[in-house]
Amino acid sequence: MPEKLNTSARRATVTRTTKETDITATIDLDGSGTGNISSGVLFLDHMLTNFSRHSGIDITLDCKGDTEVDDHHSVEDIALVLGSAFLQSLGSKTGIQRYGWAMIPMDETLARCAVDLGGRSYCVFSAEFKRPAILGFSTEMVEHFFVSLSRTMQANIHLAIMEGKNTHHMIEAMFKAFAYAMKMAVAVTGKELPSTKGTL
């Protein structure tokens, strides 16, 4: 797949163009939590803006996709691009916390997330949503988003709803839990690579 990468400090820009989507995303791990999101899927815009604000990670994202067909291609490809941008912005990973975790309440909902940025792509997702879609965003794509993200980010992501009824609250709490887990995991807390293997 065509992909262009530019990195400096803890910042990366990734561009991916296919016959289904044209996406450019910039990640700044040491930003101020500013999200400029145009995904073509309104509810995903809302979720990624929330993620940016609560993680403190700046995200600029523009996606032109075939949403007249479905939201699947855009949501999946955005996750793949963001994962690549996260991985590139982490660089050698020297000094990072590596692990992060959070539990986030939102009214009746409680979401849990744990992240390992150790180079092992694996996602465990546990949630059932009553509504099939919100503002053009298919709720079945929430799991697919995080599975795709974990693949290109080379990260282990565990996400679960512990309690919840309202679909909006459940999805938003999951994105916020992921935000706080990532905020912890990407934090620079030392000078050594957080692995006994000598590589991540």
From Swiss-Prot:
Protein name: Imidazoleglycerol-phosphate dehydratase
GO biological process terms held by the UniProt record: L-histidine biosynthetic process
GO CC terms, sorted: cytoplasm
GO molecular function: imidazoleglycerol-phosphate dehydratase activity
SUPFAM superfamilies assigned: Ribosomal protein S5 domain 2-like
The entry's keywords: Amino-acid biosynthesis, Cytoplasm, Histidine biosynthesis, Lyase
Pathway given in the UniProt record: Amino-acid biosynthesis; L-histidine biosynthesis; L-histidine from 5-phospho-alpha-D-ribose 1-diphosphate: step 6/9
Coiled-coil parts of chain: none
InterPro entries: IGPD_sf, ImidazoleglycerolP_deHydtase, ImidazoleglycerP_deHydtase_CS, Ribosomal_Su5_D2-typ_SF
Organism: Chlorobium limicola (strain DSM 245 / NBRC 103803 / 6330)
